[in-house]
């Protein structure tokens, strides 16, 4: 640990009595230092009969037996004496230019290295002087303190530089992430636009072919009629060359035929396209695509459950496709099949391909109570749709008769309330999103970029919820879509 401060050499090494370097310095009780000879010879330091004496400087009494020699100061004085007796010790650059003495002291006021003679001169009288080693040590300590402080400042600079570097890297990462997000968004838009373009062009080609086929049929029919009327005209012109007798005898037949013949106009073809292209809402399409991507993060990979499989249903080898076959002569109104997983908490999503089917039912089922269905066939509900109600544990939608989409909601009677939503794009691929905590079941039209078909709210899942499927009697397959397909 550094010392609190260097000692004033001038004050410590000078005898207050003789004003010379201390010789055999004695430390009095009052703190003054005097030469042993000065203490004995000084008339003010009279020794009384009790062995008491007084300080020649301040007069403070002290006991002779308490006198102590100051060995440290004696060593300092001895070194100063050696310098005085041996002025040639050391190199010339360590000698005082004025007195030729070795430079061993440092004057604090003048900031100069001086010799012991300079220290006693009028120029430096009253100044604070210190041993050269102590001044150097203090300077080294100050340098060390400054160095320590600057190193700490350097560490702060390095820390700030590292922070700036990290900020630069972080900013670059943020920019890169945003760049990728922008590129991904526009790539999604391009894919959506390309898909929409191909769909619109396909629809236009189909309409074009239908109109051209109609026009070709009308053209062929007109060609036949044109040929027939040309033959009639030619026949009538020939008959004009006949004799009067021949003309009168055969006139009735040809005239009758020519009079009853009339032109059959072909079926009129519309001169306008049935649908005029309108640019899609890109922001809306992208928003739907993002929402679809968000729910796809909860994709659950499962298969159809082969247990308790209806005899009219056949599963593929991987249990991801179910097909209805007419093995039994009677129709079964309960072709339902469950998924291989059940859910009691969390969020879950799956997709089903129904592109080839003209009848299907999809959704979520949970066991609530033993259902007692009316065994009598109900008029208007001969195929078992009456079971599909949330209060019976079914949250489902379906397709009937190839074009009629239905949503089965609760009602006050035995039959469900059937809603028929407008679906702009046929449902070839349907997404089902189950949120057990929120109590919702959502159906998405994946074919139309994930647009919402319907959402059941306030669903009560008192028992585990199962994915539910019913392919009905339609022989086309129903397929569980694999992840990222």
Swiss-Prot record:
GO biological process: defense response to virus; protein ubiquitination
A single GO molecular function term of this UniProt record: zinc ion binding
SUPFAM superfamilies: B-box zinc-binding domain, Concanavalin A-like lectins/glucanases, RING/U-box
Metabolic or biological pathway: Protein modification; protein ubiquitination
Domain B30.2/SPRY: start-end pairs: 282-485
Annotated zinc fingers (B box-type), start-end: 91-127
Enzyme Commission identifier(s): 2.3.2.27
Coiled coil segments of this chain: 136-170
Phenotype of null mutants: Trim34a- and TRIM34b-deficient mice show an impaired integrity of the inner mucus layer.
Cellular compartments per GO CC: mitochondrion
Function field: Functions as antiviral protein and contributes to the defense against retroviral infections. Acts as a capsid-specific restriction factor with the help of TRIM5 and prevents infection from non-host-adapted retroviruses. During influenza A virus infection, promotes programmed cell death by targeting ZBP1 for 'Lys-63'-linked polyubiquitination. In turn, promotes ZBP1 recruitment of RIPK3 to mediate virus-induced programmed necrosis. Negatively regulates the function of mitochondria by enhancing mitochondrial depolarization leading to cytochrome c release and mitochondria-dependent apoptosis.
Similarity section: Belongs to the TRIM/RBCC family.
Record-given protein name: E3 ubiquitin-protein ligase TRIM34B
Native organism: Mus musculus (Mouse)
Gene behind this protein: Trim34b
